Amino acid sequence: MLIKASFFILISIFYFCDAEIKLIQATIRHSDRNPIDGSSAFLFYPKDPYKDRDWYPDGPMELTNKGKLRAYNLGKLLREKYKDLLGPIYKPSSVYFKSIAMTRAINTAHLVAAGLFPPSSSQIWNPNLPWIPIPVYSVPTEEDVMNYAMMSCENYSIDRKKAAQEVDRLLEVIGDVQDFFDYLSLNTGVNHTRPIQGWILYHQLAAYASLGLELEPWTDKIFPDGKLVDISAIEYILQTYTDRMKRLMGGIWIKTFLDHVDDLLSGRNVERKGFFYASNEIQVGAILNTLKVYKPHIPGYASTLIFELHESNDEYYVKVVYINENNLTEFVVPGCESSVCSLETFKKVLKNVTMQSFDIDCGRKGNFSIIDL
């Protein structure tokens, strides 16, 4: 069996040597941001030493200068990696940028676009400003089914409540969580009992660390590594716990990619080669867990998950590439021969978690809060 598997891996790699990349779809977490405001911080971190700051001039949760630079540099990295596919200049027909309706994500998309497409000589309109405007599309949150099924679908809410019953079992794997929750409660000033509280705390501490602010000594035991990450990571598992949740959170992104592939291969849209979606780390984590490649971690600022379509000898292949904290990983999706997965195998092994009908999986649409679960 091992010999057979190794044979298929060698064959796929051999055929892939002369492969041509045909299309990419990238899901990008927004870049470094300011912390949340004091009124919100008080709800989960009353002892927060920075809760009275207003984060002038950009405001709470908006991109910092460090975040702006990181997003721009991500665009430059993507330019280097995909320059042959995307071509030397920006053309509206060849790429598409879309963002969730949050300014930190919208601005991340604009900055990635700026790094990805510096103006050619014919596109320079101001010699002192090497930049061209590139549109970033967005829809209102209540219409954004790709990013907010968790808050708009009754079936998701039903499954999330069922998943919540598994929290204790997941926490047992980590061990000694009650002492840890007691430690968090003592130092934050709020009673910690659920993974989502640790998840929120992690993101606040990450925002402070990104700004270079001094963290309180008690955080040394839990941040940036340690049990806080392990407990926070449970949230990504809970968000995609059932196959239906996977379809609503991660499978809808797989379907979108496959729809783009179908448009290309059928000739409906042969010009557009790059699709870039600015979102948040929830979506990145959801896609990873839906693909069954997620390992406990918090997707970092500007982390990017990319589906690549390649063609070799009239056969099509998919690669899943993950850029996180300056590391690039090519995943082997379970059921695929290697990180180079034939398109048909990719579809087959992910069939149960690929969105087929949003209306059926979603059920009644409404306004449901994951914080209450």
Question: Where do the language-model regions lie?
Answer:
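Cleavable N-terminal signal peptides of Sec/SRP-targeted secreted and luminal proteins
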Residues: 2-19
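Signature for phosphate-centric chemistry
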Residues: 19-96, 100-373
